[in-house]
Amino acid sequence: MAEVLRLEQIKKSYNVGTAVETEVLHGIDLLMQSGDFLALMGPSGSGKSTLLNIIGLLDRPTSGLLAIDGVDTATLGDAALTQLRGQTIGFIFQYHYLISAFTACENVMMPMLVDRGHPDAEMRARAEQLLDRVGLSRWRDNNAANMSGGQQQRVAIARALAMDPDLVLADEPTGNLDSKSADAVFELMRQINRERGTTFLIVTHNDELAKRCDRIVTVVDGRVA
């Protein structure tokens, strides 16, 4: 299988108004291949969010190797890093961050609009196809504000897949949902993983959902436990 993500000795330090640096990640190693479905767990303050921001190319490590699809991200400038993020990584958050005045279809089109600059028929067709995949064809022209929490998160999943990413980062994607909706959203991600071979890294505090992943990585005090 193709290698999607490689972390070698990733460290991250911050200097917050003092001359002394505080290291929050201490040499993280992680390898993910195409089709992996991994849970990332750990207590609050363990470094999970910092690690996810680095993997998502929203922040840079202080040192260590971060490679996405075999590309050493340390060799890239900010513009190239933004392009790599947009083309290879999809994001799903605990809160859906949909634009409430936009329809489901318009929300799914947003990553494509950012990439291409203007809407077209191909973009619309792609969004409709993804909404069909997440079971929301009938609601594609509904405003996001008029949808249930479970439906909104399904739209967010469709949006994360808009650019056909190799890696999807899901940060507590079921955290705001009731147990029935959470299970349905988890199963949807699992089905997409199996059908499309999309790699998923899911941050969760839900032990039962984590056990249904292929692998669990636990971060404690900035280290893989």
UniProtKB/Swiss-Prot annotation:
Membrane topology classification: Peripheral membrane protein
CDD domains for the chain: ABC_MJ0796_LolCDE_FtsE
Listed EC numbers: 7.6.2.-
Compartmental location: Cell inner membrane
Keyword terms: ATP-binding, Cell inner membrane, Cell membrane, Membrane, Nucleotide-binding, Translocase, Transport
Predominant cellular place of this UniProt entry's protein: membrane
GO biological process, any: lipoprotein localization to outer membrane
Chain ranges of the ABC transporter domain: 5-225
Residues engaged in binding ATP: 42-49
One term of GO molecular function: ATP hydrolysis activity
Role, per record: Part of the ABC transporter complex LolCDE involved in the translocation of mature outer membrane-directed lipoproteins, from the inner membrane to the periplasmic chaperone, LolA. Responsible for the formation of the LolA-lipoprotein complex in an ATP-dependent manner.
Record's subunit section: The complex is composed of two ATP-binding proteins (LolD) and two transmembrane proteins (LolC and LolE).
Protein name: Lipoprotein-releasing system ATP-binding protein LolD 2
Name of the gene encoding the protein in the UniProt record: lolD2
